Amino acid sequence: MSSSNGKPLCLIVKVKSVPGKEEELKEVLTRMIEPTRKEPGCIAYQLYSNDKNDTFFFYELWQTAAHLDAHSKTPHYERLVKERVGLVAEGGENTRLEEILV
Protein backbone atom coordinates (compact mmCIF):
# COMPACT_ATOMS: atom_id res chain seq x y z
CA MET A 1 0.00 0.00 0.00
CA SER A 2 1.59 3.27 -1.10
CA SER A 3 0.06 6.70 -1.00
CA SER A 4 -3.13 7.17 -2.97
CA ASN A 5 -1.21 8.39 -6.03
CA GLY A 6 1.25 5.48 -6.05
CA LYS A 7 4.18 7.66 -5.00
CA PRO A 8 6.28 7.25 -1.86
CA LEU A 9 4.89 8.69 1.36
CA CYS A 10 6.53 11.72 2.96
CA LEU A 11 6.26 12.49 6.66
CA ILE A 12 7.38 15.70 8.37
CA VAL A 13 7.65 15.36 12.15
CA LYS A 14 8.00 18.48 14.31
CA VAL A 15 9.35 18.01 17.84
CA LYS A 16 9.75 20.95 20.24
CA SER A 17 12.11 20.65 23.19
CA VAL A 18 11.34 21.46 26.80
CA PRO A 19 13.45 24.54 27.64
CA GLY A 20 16.91 23.50 28.85
CA LYS A 21 16.59 19.98 27.38
CA GLU A 22 17.56 20.81 23.79
CA GLU A 23 20.90 18.97 23.70
CA GLU A 24 19.53 15.92 25.48
CA LEU A 25 16.61 15.71 23.05
CA LYS A 26 18.94 16.21 20.09
CA GLU A 27 21.02 13.22 21.25
CA VAL A 28 17.92 11.02 21.64
CA LEU A 29 16.63 11.98 18.19
CA THR A 30 20.04 11.56 16.54
CA ARG A 31 20.21 7.94 17.76
CA MET A 32 17.16 7.20 15.57
CA ILE A 33 18.89 8.06 12.30
CA GLU A 34 21.20 5.09 11.66
CA PRO A 35 18.82 2.23 12.54
CA THR A 36 15.91 3.88 10.75
CA ARG A 37 17.88 4.35 7.54
CA LYS A 38 18.52 0.58 7.55
CA GLU A 39 14.81 -0.26 7.71
CA PRO A 40 13.12 -1.80 4.67
CA GLY A 41 11.27 0.84 2.70
CA CYS A 42 13.14 3.84 4.13
CA ILE A 43 14.16 6.11 1.25
CA ALA A 44 15.20 9.12 3.34
CA TYR A 45 15.37 9.95 7.04
CA GLN A 46 16.92 13.30 7.91
CA LEU A 47 16.94 15.40 11.07
CA TYR A 48 16.94 19.21 11.01
CA SER A 49 16.70 21.92 13.67
CA ASN A 50 15.57 25.52 13.65
CA ASP A 51 18.02 28.38 14.23
CA LYS A 52 17.34 28.33 17.99
CA ASN A 53 18.02 24.56 18.23
CA ASP A 54 14.84 24.14 20.27
CA THR A 55 12.65 22.61 17.57
CA PHE A 56 13.59 19.59 15.49
CA PHE A 57 12.14 18.30 12.25
CA PHE A 58 12.40 14.83 10.75
CA TYR A 59 12.01 14.57 6.99
CA GLU A 60 11.00 10.98 6.25
CA LEU A 61 10.35 9.37 2.89
CA TRP A 62 8.95 5.82 2.79
CA GLN A 63 8.24 3.50 -0.13
CA THR A 64 4.79 2.65 1.23
CA ALA A 65 2.47 3.42 4.13
CA ALA A 66 3.06 -0.14 5.36
CA HIS A 67 6.78 0.58 5.69
CA LEU A 68 6.03 3.73 7.67
CA ASP A 69 3.62 1.83 9.92
CA ALA A 70 6.24 -0.89 10.51
CA HIS A 71 8.72 1.81 11.57
CA SER A 72 6.57 2.65 14.60
CA LYS A 73 6.87 -0.95 15.82
CA THR A 74 10.68 -1.17 15.76
CA PRO A 75 12.72 -1.46 18.98
CA HIS A 76 14.52 1.84 18.31
CA TYR A 77 11.21 3.68 17.84
CA GLU A 78 9.78 2.15 21.02
CA ARG A 79 12.97 3.21 22.85
CA LEU A 80 12.53 6.77 21.52
CA VAL A 81 8.98 6.93 22.88
CA LYS A 82 10.32 6.13 26.37
CA GLU A 83 13.45 8.32 26.19
CA ARG A 84 11.65 11.45 25.01
CA VAL A 85 9.51 11.66 28.16
CA GLY A 86 10.36 14.91 29.93
CA LEU A 87 12.27 16.22 26.91
CA VAL A 88 9.48 17.03 24.46
CA ALA A 89 7.18 20.01 24.90
CA GLU A 90 3.59 19.94 23.74
CA GLY A 91 2.86 21.19 20.27
CA GLY A 92 4.59 18.53 18.21
CA GLU A 93 3.15 17.69 14.85
CA ASN A 94 3.17 14.86 12.30
CA THR A 95 2.21 15.74 8.74
CA ARG A 96 1.82 13.10 6.02
CA LEU A 97 2.36 14.47 2.55
CA GLU A 98 1.65 13.00 -0.85
CA GLU A 99 3.39 14.17 -4.00
CA ILE A 100 1.13 15.88 -6.49
CA LEU A 101 1.45 14.37 -9.94
CA VAL A 102 1.93 16.89 -12.73
Regions found by a protein language model. Name each.
Residues L25, E39, N53-T55:
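A general secondary-structure boundary signal
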Residues R31, P35-I43, L61-T95:
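An amphipathic, aromatic/His-enriched active-site/gating alpha helix that lines ligand/cofactor pockets
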Residues M1-K7, Q46-N53, L80-V102:
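Glycine-rich beta-strand-turn "strand-cap" elements at beta-sheet edges
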Residues S4-G6, V18, K38:
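Surface-exposed coil/turn segments at beta-strand junctions on protein surfaces, enriched
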Residues L9-K16, Q46-S72:
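Short, well-ordered beta-strand segments in beta-rich or mixed alpha/beta enzyme
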Residues K16-E22:
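Short, surface-exposed ligand-recognition loops at beta-strand->loop->(often short) alpha-helix junctions
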